[in-house]
Amino acid sequence: QAGSAVLANASVLVDGAAASCPAGSVRAAVAVNAADDLTAWSLADDGSISAVSGAYDAGQQTYAFDVVNGVTAIARFPFTDVVAGTWYYGAAAYAYNNGLFAGMTPTTFAPNATMTRAMLVSVLWRLAGEPAPKAPNTFVDVPDGAWYTDAVTWAAENGVVSGIGGSRFDPSGFVTREQTAEILYNYAHSKGYDVSARADLTVFPDAGSVSGWAEKALSWANAAGLINGTVRDGQTILDPQGSASRAQVAMILMNYVEHVVNA
């Protein structure tokens, strides 16, 4: 996916040959002018390509990145439907660069597409390092071998999700804003992060429409700066049952890592 836009590459050599090393153990940097649209890629021996951690240092005007699995390349952000200057551009680049989001196609991010429950759980699974589930899948609508099966199974066994009843997860269902808050809260709690912050949701005119099971999580998510109000008909509302776009969730996840994971 890096294609012809590769700007630089780096590798760890042992006796003249590229060698693998654990993620985060070797860091390199290259001089660049600006880097919101740069991403770091690891090229494995089998030819597969995966995103690795990288970040732009504006002060040094360098792009630092992990060197893993032999050769790591620096390439331009590949999505043609994520335009520089849009409110979600940095979040989409961050989520993609850190391996949290995949594109809908090699060149399409689909920022306005609605996030599904399977997509959100898969993002958190990647954030957790893609751990192998220890328990069997118990959801009747999550087939073996689907791209989200391991993520959903892991999330269920760790209390991140509990399904919608009747042994169903509804992987293709659109995730709502209050469901997003609940899932993020459960993930943070399972990792031992501080989830004590609370906001007064009554400042929003539709606070009464928040489901009882989501009140604590949405109050925390609002206090943590993850889910804020959205403007509709001149009013700032919570819109708890409203859906969330991929661009919105990318922004939420970037803030989540900054304000919760790295707090």
Predicted regions and their residues:
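Proteolytic processing hotspots in large secreted/extracellular or virion-associated proteins
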Residues: 1-39, 43-44
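C-terminal, surface-exposed recognition/capping segments
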Residues: 40, 212-225
